[in-house]
C-alpha cells in the first residue's frame, strides 16, 4: 500500500446521457455501483481517498459511507468552478502525490493506478493507443515527454494522425499541482476549468510531464446505458473466467450472471441461465438451470431447476427442487422437491417437504417464524400458519392447515373427512351424460 499517495475520484457530474434521475455513479455493474468498484481499487493502494460530488451528493455519500466510512467527501462548487480542474479546487490536498481518476471508470484496476503513482515525473497522465482516435484529445509526445493534449477540433492534419489519446487519469506531485491549479482558467467555449490544461502549464513552468500507456478497456468511461452494458459484460466475462479457472463448472457461461461479491468454494456447478446475486457463498453445490440465488449461503446442496433462494437463507446438505422459493430460511439436511414457499423458517435434518407446502409467515402486519424439527414428513398441499413449531418425528397429513404446535411423534391432520355419495353423478348430470 502506498500511503504517500492521495486519490481524488471525480463524481460530481449530472450524467445526463444516462437519461435517469439516478446519479450515474450509482448505476450498478455486476451488483455494485460503479463508484464502489473504483473505490475498492483506490483503497487497495492507499488509505487517503477523497470523492468530489455535487448532484445527489447526500445519496451518493450515504452509499459510499456504508462501505467505506473513512472516505473524505467534498462538494464541487459548480456555479463558480465547473470542470475537472474546478472539482479539485475545493479539495484539501495531502500526500506527496495526488492521483486523480473518475467515478465513471469502474474497470480501472489498482495495478493501473499504481503504475501512474510510481512513474517519476511532476505530472503523469494516462494514455492509450486508440484504433479509432476520433473525438479524443491527442497526446503530443516528444523525446519521451508530453508536450500537450490537443483536442480533436483544434488538431492539425499531422496531429489528427496521432493515435495516442488521453485516457483521463492523472497523477501529480502535490507541489506541482499546487503550482499549476491556480493558473488553470476558464477561458474556453464551455467556460470550464479543464485538468487537461495542466499539461500546457506544467511545460511552461519547466515541469516534467510523462504519459503512461494503459489498457484502453480498463479506462473505459461510462456515459450511457449502452456503454454500461458493454462494461458489465467485460466485468462478467472476467469474473466467470476466473471462477472457471478456479474450478467452477459452468454450462453455457454466457447465459449466467454472477455478482462481483459472490464467493465459491470447492467444486461447484452452475447450469445455464443461473443468476447469483449479492454476497453469496456457495460451497460444493450444484445450482441447476434458471435458478436465482440472492445473498445466501449454500453448502453441499443441489438447487433447482427454476428455484429461487431469497436473501439471508442458509441451506446445507439439502435438495431444493423446481419452483421452490426459500426466503430467510435455514435448512439443514432437508428435501423440498417442488412447488413450495418456505419463508422465515428453520427446518432440521431428515425432513421432507411435500409438494405445495406453504409457510404462511405474514398476517398483514408482521412476519412470523415456522420451526420444523428433525425427521418430519410434511404432506402435499400443507399450510403452516406461523408462528408454529413442529417437533421431531411428526407426520403432517396432506391438505392440512396447521395453526397449532405439534408435539413429537404425532400425526397432525386438519381437513374435512371424505364422504362418497353413490350415484350422485347420474343424479346431478342426468342419465344421458353417463358414459359406458
UniProtKB/Swiss-Prot annotation:
Give the residue ranges for region: N-acetyltransferase.
Answer: 247-436
Q: Where are the active-site residues found?
A: 338
Pathway stated in the Swiss-Prot or TrEMBL entry: Nucleotide-sugar biosynthesis; UDP-N-acetyl-alpha-D-glucosamine biosynthesis; N-acetyl-alpha-D-glucosamine 1-phosphate from alpha-D-glucosamine 6-phosphate (route II): step 2/2; Nucleotide-sugar biosynthesis; UDP-N-acetyl-alpha-D-glucosamine biosynthesis; UDP-N-acetyl-alpha-D-glucosamine from N-acetyl-alpha-D-glucosamine 1-phosphate: step 1/1; Bacterial outer membrane biogenesis; LPS lipid A biosynthesis
Query: Where along the chain is Mg(2+) bound?
Result: 104, 223
- EC number(s)? 2.7.7.23, 2.3.1.157
Transferase is among the record's keywords:
yes
**Keywords per UniProt:** Acyltransferase, Cell shape, Cell wall biogenesis/degradation, Cytoplasm, Magnesium, Metal-binding, Multifunctional enzyme, Nucleotidyltransferase, Peptidoglycan synthesis, Repeat, Transferase
Region described as Pyrophosphorylase: spans on this chain? 1-225
Instruction: Give the protein's function.
Output: Catalyzes the last two sequential reactions in the de novo biosynthetic pathway for UDP-N-acetylglucosamine (UDP-GlcNAc). The C-terminal domain catalyzes the transfer of acetyl group from acetyl coenzyme A to glucosamine-1-phosphate (GlcN-1-P) to produce N-acetylglucosamine-1-phosphate (GlcNAc-1-P), which is converted into UDP-GlcNAc by the transfer of uridine 5-monophosphate (from uridine 5-triphosphate), a reaction catalyzed by the N-terminal domain.
Instruction: Quote the protein name from its UniProt record.
Output: Bifunctional protein GlmU
Amino acid at each position: 500500500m502506498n500511503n504517500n499517495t492521495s486519490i481524488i475520484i471525480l463524481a460530481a457530474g449530472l450524467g445526463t446521457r444516462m437519461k435517469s434521475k439516478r446519479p450515474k455513479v450509482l448505476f450498478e455493474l455486476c451488483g455494485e455501483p460503479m463508484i464502489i468498484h473504483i473505490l475498492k481499487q483506490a483503497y487497495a493502494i492507499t488509505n487517503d481517498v477523497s470523492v468530489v460530488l455535487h448532484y445527489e451528493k447526500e445519496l451518493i455519500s450515504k452509499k459510499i459511507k456504508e462501505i467505506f466510512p473513512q472516505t473524505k467527501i467534498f462538494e464541487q462548487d459548480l456555479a463558480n468552478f465547473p470542470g475537472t480542474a474546478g472539482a479539485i479546487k475545493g479539495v484539501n490536498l495531502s500526500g506527496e502525490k495526488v492521483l486523480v481518476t473518475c467515478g465513471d471508470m469502474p474497470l480501472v484496476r489498482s495495478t493501473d493506478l499504481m503504475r501512474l503513482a510510481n512513474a517519476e515525473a511532476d505530472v503523469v497522465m494516462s494514455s492509450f493507443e486508440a484504433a479509432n482516435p476520433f473525438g479524443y484529445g491527442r497526446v503530443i509526445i516528444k523525446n519521451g515527454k508530453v508536450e500537450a493534449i490537443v483536442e480533436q477540433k483544434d488538431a492539425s492534419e499531422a496531429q489528427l494522425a496521432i493515435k495516442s489519446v488521453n485516457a483521463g487519469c492523472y497523477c501529480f506531485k502535490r507541489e506541482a499541482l499546487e503550482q499549476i491549479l491556480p493558473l488553470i482558467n476558464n477561458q474556453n467555449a464551455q467556460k470550464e476549468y479543464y485538468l487537461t490544461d495542466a499539461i500546457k502549464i506544467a511545460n511552461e513552468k519547466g515541469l516534467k510531464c510523462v504519459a503512461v500507456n494503459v489498457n484502453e478497456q480498463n479506462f473505459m468511461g461510462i456515459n450511457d446505458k449502452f456503454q454500461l452494458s458493454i462494461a458489465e459484460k467485460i466485468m462478467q466475462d472476467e469474473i466467470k473466467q476466473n471462477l472457471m479457472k478456479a474450478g467452477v463448472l459452468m454450462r453455457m457461461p454466457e447465459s449466467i450472471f454472477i455478482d462481483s461479491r459472490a464467493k465459491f468454494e470447492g467444486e461447484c456447478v452452475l447450469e445455464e441461465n443461473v443468476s447469483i446475486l449479492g454476497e453469496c457463498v456457495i460451497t460444493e453445490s450444484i445450482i441447476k438451470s434458471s435458478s436465482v440465488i440472492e445473498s445466501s449461503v449454500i453448502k453441499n446442496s443441489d438447487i433447482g431447476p427454476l428455484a429461487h433462494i431469497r436473501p439471508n437463507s442458509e441451506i446445507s446438505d439439502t435438495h431444493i427442487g423446481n419452483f421452490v422459493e426459500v426466503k430467510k430460511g435455514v435448512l439443514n439436511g432437508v428435501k423440498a422437491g417442488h412447488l413450495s414457499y418456505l419463508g422465515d423458517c428453520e427446518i432440521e435434518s431428515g425432513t421432507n417437504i411435500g409438494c405445495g407446502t406453504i409457510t404462511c409467515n405474514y398476517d398483514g402486519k408482521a412476519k412470523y417464524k415456522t420451526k420444523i424439527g428433525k425427521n418430519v414428513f410434511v404432506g402435499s398441499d400443507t399450510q403452516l400458519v406461523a408462528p408454529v413449531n413442529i417437533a421431531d418425528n411428526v407426520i403432517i397429513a396432506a391438505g392440512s392447515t396447521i395453526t397449532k404446535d405439534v408435539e413429537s411423534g404425532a400425526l397432525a391432520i386438519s381437513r374435512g373427512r371424505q364422504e362418497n355419495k353413490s350415484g350422485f353423478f347420474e343424479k346431478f348430470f342426468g342419465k344421458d351424460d353417463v358414459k359406458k
